[in-house]
Swiss-Prot record:
The lineage of its organism: Eukaryota, Metazoa, Chordata, Craniata, Vertebrata. The record marks E294 as: Increases basicity of active site His. GO terms for molecular function: argininosuccinate lyase activity; structural constituent of eye lens. HAMAP family: Arg_succ_lyase. The active site is at H160, S281. It comes from Gallus gallus. This is Argininosuccinate lyase.
């Protein structure tokens, strides 16, 4: 058992901590990844202590030198975590004392693990968001550039998983790119709101030692300083916001994955996944399974669960710090790791995807042009509701005769409406169909080209802000 007296907080305790309690209380296995940012925060705080007259110049130099040594040990993988190390803060402070002696005990003057850990977490997540944003922008770029290259490929568009209208393959790709751009913007907004410095808030009442928080803000590259110490040490809005944005991002990636899973089936055959992003069956030798996409789809549920877990932790807490908040790190670290992996795999899938243009063209059946038949009558002056009915009658007549709608004779069509004339034959042309959707956001080539250019500009802007 670990002695209570060995703890940073052990002065008023006697005896030893129950071993199961020790295990439950420890977070070092999870929060080791905070090691570097914890050292950064300590270096900044040491400088603030020296400015406040708590540390001498010599003491500051010894502390900074010791912290640099600890940072080097972590980076080389030689830092030895001991059983008594309750968390990353305890581990680093214990090691600092081993290196420089009792002077290390001055570093925590006026500082609490309450403001220390939330500062560490913000520092790490700001960096993590930058990495995630870079991977996300690469995925968006891959979608956009593929859309530009394959702009002349036409496929059926679907609603309710039923054939609806002809669209450009590029329109499909860009629909996902646009959703992901919103996710990129949201990540930037979360990072901006996260950049509020909590260090210097103490346990809950603030810092009594005239610590220069502006110095801390500048040293740690935060945009502003927290307004209220009680709020600063307990707020985890930034964790919830990041997990919420991650949830939306995973919804969009899951939708993309589901679309491509369907399109890659033998029944559709629109796309073929690269072997690098597929697996086989242990029993069925003919199988090529889209496991990469299925895993992306399933990871969405994992991220949703992490958000729900953090929300449930927060919803019953009183003000200021409570140990419940220790649960935030495992959840958010897992989501960061999941997003980082998923985005790279998604980019790989899109960049190596084989498009089967011939199969897409075969699926462009004449019934997809039924709406165009109604629009033909609208352009002849018929109200749309009447034109919709007339087109529906043409579909029914073709089904009754057992022929495709484009095989109806002019006489057949005239029996439905006298407005049909010989030029109706132009309706049954796939390219003409997609080219009529010229309004902003439509699937005409001019509109898709405009979307591509606008997305390129948005990508450039987002990259500058990432």
């Amino acid at each position: 058992m670990a002695s209570e007296g060995d703890k940073l907080w052990g002065g008023r305790f006697s005896g030893s901590t129950d071993p199961i309690m020790e295990m439950l209380n420890s977070s070092i296995a999870c929060d080791q990844r905070l090691s570097e940012v914890d050292i950064q925060g300590s270096m900044a705080y040491a400088k603030a202590l020296e400015k406040a007259g708590i540390l001498t110049k010599t003491e500051l130099e010894k502390i900074l030198s010791g912290l640099e040594k600890i940072s080097e040990e972590w980076s080389k993988g030689v830092f030895v975590v001991k059983q008594s190390d309750e968390d990353i803060h305890t581990a680093n402070e214990r090691r600092l004392k081993e290196l420089i002696g009792d002077i290390a005990g001055k570093l925590h003057t006026g500082r609490s693990r309450n403001d220390q850990v939330v500062t560490d977490l913000k520092l790490l997540l700001k960096s993590s968001i930058s990495v995630i944003s870079t991977h996300l922008l690469q995925l968006i770029k891959t979608l956009v550039e593929r859309a530009a290259t394959e702009i002349d490929v036409i496929m059926p568009g679907y609603t309710h998983l039923q054939k609806a209208l002809p669209i450009r393959w590029s329109q499909f790709l860009l629909s996902h790119a646009v959703a992901l751009i919103r996710d990129s913007e949201r990540l930037g907004e979360v990072k901006k709101r996260m950049s509020v410095l909590p260090l210097g808030s103490g346990a809950l009442a603030g810092n009594p030692l005239e610590i220069d928080r502006e110095l801390l803000r500048s040293e740690l590259d935060f945009a502003s300083i927290s307004l209220n110490s009680m709020d600063a040490i307990s707020e985890r809005d930034f964790v919830v916001e990041l997990l919420s944005v991650a949830t939306l991002l995973m919804i969009h990636l899951s939708k993309l994955a589901e679309d491509l899973i369907i399109f890659s089936t033998t029944e559709f055959g629109f796309v073929t996944l690269s072997d690098a992003y597929s697996t086989g069956s242990s029993l069925l030798p003919q199988k090529k399974n889209p496991d990469s996409l299925e895993l992306i789809r399933s990871k969405a549920g994992r991220v949703f669960g992490r958000l729900a877990a953090v929300l449930m932790v927060l919803k019953g807490l009183p003000s200021t710090y409570n140990k419940d908040l220790q649960e935030d790190k495992e959840a958010v670290f897992d989501v960061v790791d999941t997003l980082t992996a998923v985005l790279q795999v998604a980019t790989g899938v899109i960049s190596t995807l084989q498009v089967n243009k011939e199969n897409m063209e075969k699926a462009l059946t004449p019934e997809l042009l039924s709406t165009d038949l109604a629009l033909y009558l609208v352009r002849k002056g018929m109200p749309f509701r009447q034109a919709h009915v007339a087109s529906g009658k043409a579909v029914h007549l073709a089904e009754t005769k057992g022929i495709a709608i484009n095989k109806l004779t002019l006489e057949d069509l005239k029996s439905i409406s006298p407005l049909f004339a010989s030029d109706v034959s132009q309706v049954f042309n796939i390219v003409n169909s997609v080219e009529q959707y010229t309004a902003v956001g439509g699937t005409a080539k001019s509109s898709v080209t405009a979307q591509i250019e606008q997305l390129r500009e948005l990508l450039k802007k987002q990259k500058e802000q990432a």
